[in-house]
Amino acid sequence: MDDRFAALRDATASALLRGPGATSVELRQLIARGEPPPDLSSLVEQIRSHAYTVTNEDVDALRARYTEEQLFEIIVAAAFGAAQERLSAARRVLEGA
């Protein structure tokens, strides 16, 4: 199946998961895989499964440990990882049809 957006996704993944940032590359990769450290597990799981339910209070609870830039990267890595997994699952179904 042709994937005309693969190069764009790869560039996004490279910048997000392997580029410089306020958080470590390792942390962003763990989060994208759905394997965050314990202090982030609740937020990351919520983003990956029910992002629409995340509230300011959920994020505020982490502000004592993480900067605004770090929280942004954490949230984006969680959303990107979930999106990648869903896209991969959908492509497998379509290719099997």
Question: Model segments located where?
Answer:
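Hydrophobic alpha-helical segments
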Residues: M1-A97
